[in-house]
Amino acid sequence: MSEFLLIEERGGVGLITLSRPKAMNALSLGMVRGIAGALRRWKDDPTIHAIAMRGSDKNGPFGNFCAGGDIRFFHEVAMAGTPQLEDFFTEEYALNYLTHHLGKPLIAFLDGIVFGGGMGLCQGATHRLVTGRTKMAMPETLIGLFADVGGGYFLSRCPGAAGQWLALTGQHINADQAISLDLADWHIEAAHQTAAWDGLQTLDWTKAQALDTWLQGHTVAAQAGPPYPDMHAWGLINRHFSHATVAEILQSLDTDPDPWAQETAAGLRKRSPVMLHVALEHVRRARTMSLADDLRMERDMVRHCFHSAHLGRSGAATDTVEGIRALVIDKDQNPQWNPARVEDVTLQMVEPFFQSPWPVFSHPLKDLV
């Protein structure tokens, strides 16, 4: 059990509170293991009728859900070359899979920050509740990584070209945008979350409509409307991010005088050129994959991110560790990507990220079906 988790059972509900406010509930290996252990136990417990998850901030429950994986930890263990890095990704991805296969309601209160690993933790929930404070993102390309934790699976199933846009740019989206892109289900007032959380624990689970009645009393369902709250941006997303390659996307953005297009192009050029190509190919491949196959592919990919043998790099020499250094460790915001330009990335640099370093029978996630 992790010191950063509060795990309880009340009123037939399994309750998980992420409680690492100084790190915006970034997931440690201990937290991953604690959450997975609780979910596995409750999955087969007939006295647990539903499971709920929330985060906390310095003021108490709610405020932020989860800022993702602990990237300081990633840097530390990558530099040290310890096996904990391998353990983290294997166990985190197995947890992501588990959240989709509990066989009972999983209610995620997605208040505040919901980034990266937080998205992986919540996208398998049957009930994803967002607030006016919600900020969702898959910002991994900013640190030379890709949208993992099942990101290929759930982003590739967003409408239009939204998945490619989110995977490449790491753009933050709000509650209404998340609902429109099928990344959330219901809106709940931030101030009403405590009452809703407490109310879950008083339901009569012998009544088939108990959870539906609770939802009606505490949330607002998505309303029929335009496919995206900002229809101007929606048109630009689909126009530019439907192109087949990163170079074509950038060329399309560069030739569009719209400020949105110019800002987006400038943002993309701050990302790792190699990982932009990898991230786009990842979403395209995942579109026809099961969740299990996508997670296995992502496990292969993340291994190559920290051990890019085909590029002759490992540890600090990889774009991933360099990106973490620049963003989080030294905070100079000046990563030295290799290569430095999108135009210099070749297929030979990208394709090996999708080749498994393990035979099928010994893959770390071979048991996912």
Outline where the language-model segments fall.
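Contiguous mid-protein beta-loop-alpha structural module that forms a pocket-lining wall or clamp
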Residues: 148-210
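An acidic, glycine-rich surface segment that forms the CoA-thioester-binding/catalytic face
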Residues: 71-110, 151, 350-359
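A structural preference for short, pocket-lining loop segments at secondary-structure junctions
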Residues: 16-19, 34-79, 98-109, 131-134
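Amphipathic alpha-helical blocks and their helix-capping loop/short-beta junctions
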Residues: 183, 189-271, 275
